[in-house]
């Protein structure tokens, strides 16, 4: 038995091996649509507690594994989790997302940021990832994840999520030198954090550039792409064999650029037909996605038809089945179960 045959299904596909069906997991698969999660949330109402107390985060991460046996089990965390380690204090408000206590608006604030030391700032991440690897063994692939420089900068500068991103765009277009300094520091910290996750047990890492789709293609080329490349290059220097995934929300306008990031796998959202995505990204690029999360409100037949359509368009190599973004909080849990059941039968359905 070679190493290949004992590696978990998703990891094999992510490396480019031919597998009998596309592996499947779901973004935000640990979350509010699950009764088990809602029950736990009553006991631990703070998101930071749920994601930073190891035994709680381990339990949450494993809830979908125990319920549905996805091919990927992802660390339960948030993209802003490493920011306090740089000196950017924050909290995560229930239903509202990250709140930055002192938004980064000046050169002096950027100069005060410190390099990330994950062993000191984020020791719980190692504990969680080691436990997940031990729990799932070779039955599933453990995924880590990080935020991308532009998206973390957007939170740090805006102070919270935004519909217009007017503050960071003002900085980008009026005082780009300051923003580039911030993006550089964030890129180096994110690379350190991703390496720490891999060393702690993550077998695949996904980078979320959630807000880069808010940029025009020319501004993406200036403020997002070079820093995605910087992160991925640094990870690959030390961990060349770890597959890296890139997600950009609303990425239809920058899909080809995502393929230039250094990622091994590009997450496609539902605004791009999967067949078109394959054509635009080229035969060598692996893809992930791309069902509209809203499909999971529908009948079982509709869900099955959409899964089969997506998988046929993606072809029989280099595809990880997923939604185009996170599962929605009011999704019927039994429909998530059906999604996974159907995915596991794709070797006979397609």
Curated annotation (Swiss-Prot):
Residues at the site labelled Transition state stabilizer: 78
Keyword field contains Lyase: yes
Catalytic activity: uroporphyrinogen III + 4 H(+) = coproporphyrinogen III + 4 CO2
Annotated Pfam families: URO-D
Subcellular location: Cytoplasm
UniProt superkingdom: Bacteria
UniProt entry keywords in alphabetical sequence: Cytoplasm, Decarboxylase, Lyase, Porphyrin biosynthesis
Enzyme Commission no: 4.1.1.37
One function term, GO molecular function aspect: uroporphyrinogen decarboxylase activity
Binding of substrate, residues: 28-32, 47, 78, 155, 210, 325
GO cellular component: cytoplasm
Chief location bin: cytoplasm
UniProt pathway: Porphyrin-containing compound metabolism; protoporphyrin-IX biosynthesis; coproporphyrinogen-III from 5-aminolevulinate: step 4/4
InterPro entries: UROD/MetE-like_sf (IPR038071), Uroporphyrinogen_deCO2ase_HemE (IPR006361), Uroporphyrinogen_deCOase (IPR000257)
Gene3D superfamilies assigned to the protein according to its UniProt record, in alphabetical order: 3.20.20.210
Family: Belongs to the uroporphyrinogen decarboxylase family.
Subunit description: Homodimer.
Function: Catalyzes the decarboxylation of four acetate groups of uroporphyrinogen-III to yield coproporphyrinogen-III.
PANTHER family, per database record: METHYLTETRAHYDROFOLATE:HOMOCYSTEINE METHYLTRANSFERASE RELATED, UROPORPHYRINOGEN DECARBOXYLASE
Designated name of the protein: Uroporphyrinogen decarboxylase
Top-level taxonomy: Bacteria, Bacillati, Cyanobacteriota, Cyanophyceae, Nostocales
The encoding gene: hemE
């Amino acid at each position: 038995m070679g190493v290949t045959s004992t590696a978990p299904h998703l990891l094999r596909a992510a490396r480019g091996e031919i597998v009998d069906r596309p592996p499947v997991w779901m973004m935000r698969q640990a979350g509010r649509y699950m009764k088990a999660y809602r029950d736990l949330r009553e006991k631990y109402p703070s998101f930071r507690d749920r994601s930073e107390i190891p035994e709680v985060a381990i339990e949450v991460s494993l809830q979908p594994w125990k319920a549905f046996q996805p091919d990927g089990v992802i660390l339960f965390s948030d993209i802003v989790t490493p920011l306090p380690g740089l000196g950017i204090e924050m909290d995560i408000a229930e239903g509202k997302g990250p709140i930055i206590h002192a938004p980064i608006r000046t050169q002096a604030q950027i100069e005060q940021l410190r390099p990330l030391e994950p062993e000191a700032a984020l020791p719980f991440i190692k504990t969680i990832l080691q436990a997940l690897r031990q729990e799932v063994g070779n039955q599933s692939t453990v995924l880590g994840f990080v935020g991308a420089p532009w998206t973390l900068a957007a939170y740090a500068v805006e102070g919270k999520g935004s519909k217009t991103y007017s503050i960071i765009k003002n900085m980008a277009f009026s005082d780009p030198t300051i923003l580039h300094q911030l993006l550089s520091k964030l890129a180096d910290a994110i690379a350190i954090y991703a390496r720490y996750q891999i060393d702690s047990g993550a077998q695949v890492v996904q980078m979320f550039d959630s807000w880069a789709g808010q940029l025009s293609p020319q501004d993406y080329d200036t403020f997002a792409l070079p820093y995605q490349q910087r992160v991925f290059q640094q990870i690959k220097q030390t961990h060349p064999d770890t597959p890296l995934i890139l997600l950009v929300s609303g990425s239809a306008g920058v899909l080809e650029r995502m393929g230039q990031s250094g990622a091994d796998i590009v997450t496609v959202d539902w605004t791009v037909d999967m067949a078109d995505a394959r054509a635009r990204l080229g035969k060598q690029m692996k893809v992930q996605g791309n069902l509209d999360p809203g499909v999971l409100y529908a009948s079982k037949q509709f869900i099955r038809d959409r899964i089969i359509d997506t998988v046929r368009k993606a072809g029989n190599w280099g595809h990880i089945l997923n939604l185009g973004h996170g599962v929605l909080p009011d999704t019927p849990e039994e429909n998530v179960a059906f999604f996974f059941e159907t995915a596991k039968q794709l070797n006979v359905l397609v």
